[in-house]
Amino acid sequence: MEVILLEKIGKIGNLGEVVKVRSGYGRNFLIPQGKALPATSENKSVFEAQRADYEARQAEILADAETLAAKVDEVSVVMKRPAGAMDKLFGSVTSADIAVFYKDLGLNIPRNIIDVLTPIRTLGEHQVRVRLHPDVVRVISIQVERAVK
């Protein structure tokens, strides 16, 4: 299935490109999410007529992502968790926990854009990737400390 991308999508293509994707991915994800249009001649002409609007919207989204990235860089993430004698956590720190941490600070970062590179199951410093936009990716440090009982 060929689609016209309405925004930049990592590993697939940029705004306005006609790319070939799996039919299910196009029908079930890209098109319903408003990220693509089926590549028909009618849709191509509609896209070209509205191309400037799409580009302006993408520039605005990129600017918002860069602003959010600056705020993410300012915050030091410290998570307090109960741990055993060998500094192993009872459970783990997940992307949902990190999203809740940011939400408590007033930053809207959904858990699906937070990539925990390695499972966080011990005390100490860990690296996590936050994909705010295909062009704006930050690697942040998370400090996990023992919770005081």
From Swiss-Prot:
It comes from the Bacteria. One of its GO terms (molecular function) is structural constituent of ribosome. It holds the Pfam family Ribosomal_L9_C. SUPFAM superfamilies: L9 N-domain-like (SSF55658), Ribosomal protein L9 C-domain (SSF55653). GO terms for cellular component: ribonucleoprotein complex; ribosome. One of its GO terms (biological process) is translation. Belongs to the bacterial ribosomal protein bL9 family. Binds to the 23S rRNA. HAMAP family: Ribosomal_bL9. This is Large ribosomal subunit protein bL9. It comes from Magnetococcus marinus (strain ATCC BAA-1437 / JCM 17883 / MC-1).
